[in-house]
Design a protein with these regions (language model features):
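A conserved amphipathic helix/loop scaffold
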Residues: 1-158
Length: 158
């Protein structure tokens, strides 16, 4: 489906389109509109939900970042990679792809390490790439890891 909006107070955060001469014809995937003291987000879901897997990683990462805003952790990865966060400061990252993938787990700067629950290995953080924003952005850390096809890793974060 296509979301049509006839207002200038809504902004396309993620859009899809096809290149044209001198520009792009955009179709909103994720819209943001200021509402009261917050923001209202509208995420366009394709008629065939399986098409969500076709979104590029950059679009998925932006959707994940915004939808995880109230959490202290989010995932940057291609499609078919899941992040499962639990209330005891543990998480599982699972790769549902048929090939290996590289992922980044982005956390608040208070998270200083990830401990692999299977083998005890410690992942040290790297400074996350800054997000462009007009508002002050909280400092973030990122943890890079590789996942084999159809595998998962469990971590405790501290």
């Amino acid at each position: 489906p296509q979301v049509q909006y006839y207002t200038n107070d809504a902004w396309e955060v993620v859009s899809a389109g096809r290149p044209l001469t001198g520009g792009v014809s955009g179709y909103p995937i994720l819209l943001r509109a200021p509402y009261a003291a917050g923001n209202l987000y509208v995420l366009t879901i394709p008629d065939d939900m399986g098409n969500l897997y076709d979104f590029p990683a950059k679009a998925l990462n932006e959707i994940r970042r915004i939808m995880s805003r109230d959490m202290d952790i989010y995932l940057e990865a291609p499609s078919k990679v899941g992040l499962f966060v639990y209330d005891n400061k543990t998480l599982v990252v699972e790769n549902f792809n048929d090939e290996p993938v590289e992922v980044r787990i982005v956390t608040d700067d208070e998270v200083t390490r990830l401990e692999n629950l299977e083998n005890g290995d410690i992942l040290a953080p790297l400074p996350a790439e800054p997000v462009q924003s007009r508002r002050p952005v909280t400092p973030k850390n990122s943890f890079r890891l590789s996942l084999l096809p159809h595998s998962y890793k469990a971590f405790q974060y501290k």
